[in-house]
A protein has these predicted regions:
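Conserved N-terminal beta1-alpha1 strand-loop-helix module at the mouth
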Residues: 1-60, 65-87, 166, 287-288, ...
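Conserved, mostly hydrophobic/aromatic
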Residues: 20, 58, 93, 119, ...
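Conserved anion-binding
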Residues: 26, 31, 98-199, 217
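Active-site-adjacent beta->alpha loops and helix N-cap segments on the catalytic face
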Residues: 67-83, 99-103, 123-138, 202-212, ...
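A C-terminal functional module that forms or caps the active site or interfaces directly
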Residues: 202-245, 265-273
Length: 310
């Protein structure tokens, strides 16, 4: 199944916007697995089995596996997810970004070796660094846009000078912020296949609303809820298709009379709200899987409840 239809099906079946991030740290595993990297698959598979009916997606972070020479366990884990929860897409969080020939190899890694359903990418090197991934029909690509870390502002919140004669509201127009430029490109000329999405941190709800206004039909992967401090209600209100935060479409360089014409009524893209540590390490005891399920269930319900205005 193609990534976006699969995502929408999981959202409907599980009534969920929650994505569980799989970031295994052996030092935090329960006894007797604590410190044993050979148990990465066992730990993550137990989390998957306990939460599969609570999520819209799973998101393994490749560095947490590669650091422990556990890439083979990552392969097994993704295969396990596809077996026990075939309706739930797997987003491989790798944030790849390189020139075309190297990107081709990263695409083989993600979609042939690991058989992920979607992949996170850095758009910094431009469209030709993304094209090789588009050769894989049905696979989703989620581009970094406004990330949850404080240092993201060093680049993503910088204003573009742009050509003085650029049409207002077009990508690269003077006064546009870099993250806005990325959102416009992803929603417009780069999205030829209809399989792009954007990554926007839960720690910046105003920016989520802005990105949603610029990209009303794209899926938004929103990390940062839970241990990173993102607020579930603010996140949903800003990004959900029925939310209240994406109504104006006004850029930071526009007046109140100049808008993009994109409103919440046109918003169809799902949101994928990711939580990792709060779920994975809800308990350090033998009940870690049931504790993870309890946290995932509570988070899912909080996200669903946040859809209601008021």
């Amino acid at each position: 199944m193609n990534f976006i239809p699969q995502l929408l099906a999981a959202e409907k079946t599980n009534q969920s916007m929650l994505c569980v991030g799989l970031d295994p740290e052996p030092a935090r595993f329960p006894a007797p697995w604590q410190g044993d990297a050979r148990r990465i698959f066992d730990f993550c598979a137990a989390i998957v089995d306990a939460t599969a009916d609570q999520v819209i997606a799973f998101k393994p972070q490749i560095a947490y596996f590669a650091a422990h020479r556990a890439e083979d366990q990552l392969e097994r884990l993704i295969a396990h997810i596809h077996q026990v929860a075939p309706q739930v897409p797997v987003i491989l969080d790798a944030k790849r970004g390189d020139i075309g020939s190297t990107a081709q190899q990263y695409a083989v890694e993600a979609f042939e070796r690991y058989r992920a359903d979607a992949l996170t990418l850095s758009p910094f090197m431009g469209f030709d660094s993304i094209e090789p991934y588009l050769q894989y029909d049905g696979k989703g690509l989620l581009l970094l846009c406004r990330t949850s870390n404080p240092g993201g502002s060093d680049l993503q919140a910088q204003r573009l000078a742009g050509p003085a004669d650029r049409t207002p509201g077009a990508p690269g127009a003077p006064g546009e912020l870099l993250f806005e430029h990325i959102a416009r490109l992803a929603a417009g000329p780069w999205n030829r296949s209809g399989r792009l999405g954007l990554v926007v941190g839960a720690t910046y709800p105003a920016e989520i609303a802005r990105v949603r206004a610029l990209a009303p039909t794209l899926p938004l992967l929103i990390p940062g809820v839970g241990a990173q401090g993102g607020d579930a209600q603010a996140t949903v209100r800003a990004g959900w298709r029925g939310g209240t935060g994406q109504s104006s479409g006004q850029t930071s360089g526009q007046t109140s009379g100049q808008t993009s014409g994109q409103t919440s009524g046109q918003t169809t893209g799902p949101i994928i709200v990711s939580s990792s540590r709060a779920v994975l390490y809800a308990s350090a005891a033998a009940d870690f899987a049931s504790a993870a399920r309890a946290v995932a269930s509570a988070t899912r319900q909080a996200l669903q409840a946040a859809r209601a205005p008021g």
